[in-house]
UniProtKB/Swiss-Prot annotation:
It is a multi-pass membrane protein. The gene is ST7. PANTHER family: SUPPRESSION OF TUMORIGENICITY 7, SUPPRESSOR OF TUMORIGENICITY 7 PROTEIN. Keywords: Glycoprotein, Membrane, Phosphoprotein, Transmembrane, Transmembrane helix. It comes from the Eukaryota. It is found in: Membrane. It holds the Pfam family ST7. The modification Phosphoserine is found at S386. InterPro entries: ST7 (IPR007311). Belongs to the ST7 family. This is Suppressor of tumorigenicity 7 protein.
Amino acid sequence: MAEAATGFLEQLKSCIVWSWTYLWTVWFFIVLFLVYILRVPLKINDNLSTVSMFLNTLTPKFYVALTGTSSLISGLILIFEWWYFRKYGTSFIEQVSVSHLRPLLGGVDNNSSNNSNSSNGDSDSNRQSVSECKVWRNPLNLFRGAEYNRYTWVTGREPLTYYDMNLSAQDHQTFFTCDSDHLRPADAIMQKAWRERNPQARISAAHEALEINEIRSRVEVPLIASSTIWEIKLLPKCATAYILLAEEEATTIAEAEKLFKQALKAGDGCYRRSQQLQHHGSQYEAQHRRDTNVLVYIKRRLAMCARRLGRTREAVKMMRDLMKEFPLLSMFNIHENLLEALLELQAYADVQAVLAKYDDISLPKSATICYTAALLKARAVSDKFSPEAASRRGLSTAEMNAVEAIHRAVEFNPHVPKYLLEMKSLILPPEHILKRGDSEAIAYAFFHLAHWKRVEGALNLLHCTWEGTFRMIPYPLEKGHLFYPYPICTETADRELLPSFHEVSVYPKKELPFFILFTAGLCSFTAMLALLTHQFPELMGVFAKAMSDIFCSAEFRDWNCKSIFMRVEDELEIPPAPQSQHFQN
């Protein structure tokens, strides 16, 4: 019964929609016919005469007040529309018209929409999963104590947001802890330290973990089987405590490097011991996974310290060795550190070799990969590139490849060119970035701006060609050219990652709908007329009379000119030529 009732209601609704869509003229004439028949019982003539009498008795002040009230209501609607547009990025009236009025007028077929939703469900879910805004660890992140804190001491501004630091705390708990940490006192202390919000409390906990390891303890390990001779050993050093001190307490890169070297000595020993025991159970396997993450992190940060201190070749060697030793750990994105160091050495052939390995369609892209590929192709033609010459003779094959590479990079992250061309000021990059977002653009430009400046003409080529990308993707939120559509959620995530004193770059820029602009103009013009009429009624009356006379005279002049032209055409009409005498009979 319920299904039958539902089907009957759907049929009734479809009939009503069909009647409103195709038979609106019939409905209109039916209404007029009913009004004509019921004109006597409804006393329409008397009501019309009463209304006309009421309107004739109204004074000009009433119309002024009515105009002012309508202007006030229009202004309130405009303010609400502007607020709704700033918050949600769309017009409220347009959304209501499309979402509610259009289905009532028969613009949407429920059956077809359901079928399309069921058939395209997989593609929609894939689109959502791809466009989901995932936050990534910045592979080129700075040191808190030696770089971020020094910036705070000088400027008084906090370069990191609470959301960014909270993500870092979650990363540290994921990389540097495991379920068996409670069995070792130092690791148990560090497990609590990574959750601590106060920096001084974290540093104190790291010192406490190191002090525990200074106590000599008797480890019951027989030197000889079935022997009563015991060896006295020192507890292994806590590598994660050294990591925390190097990241947050060290005020210079040199101090951080010393602490990381001590962490490397402790972490390497723990890694070798857990490597031998990893197959003895899930607990040992988790410890080995944790020790591997700790060792990779320490070596990567040591390479970054060498890069900061000017030992670039040493840093490149350390990064290459680390990538060979742990090829499966791609979550640290060490290849991006390697690309930046190779660009500093101007080893462009090695950079091309790294790009050939990582610039693959199956791997996730980044601004570093896309813009480095564009830089290499621009380097081949940028020194001889001239916009005037290119407009005359056209682009060569190499120039076309460079322009296409720039368009590809700009489509992936459209925020980078403004920082490379110094149209926007740079800030310290955050510890986490959003791919294709403003945070990734800042992180890339902060380290790679010098490499673009070093290549002669590269920034000039970028300046001349980067805006051409937007003509290829007129609707970037709906359809991309080489990549997926640009995600909508980048602005919100970037505002969480970047400090409040930075103006977040928004793409694509939200433009005010025509309805809001038209309402604003009409409201302002009507309010101005009402105010002038109230203040200067006689002058506005003269002005209105003059405008009506002008329009009437203009219409009369147009009609008079047309009549004159018609008379002239009639008078200038050429009569037919007489026949020649040679053809008369």
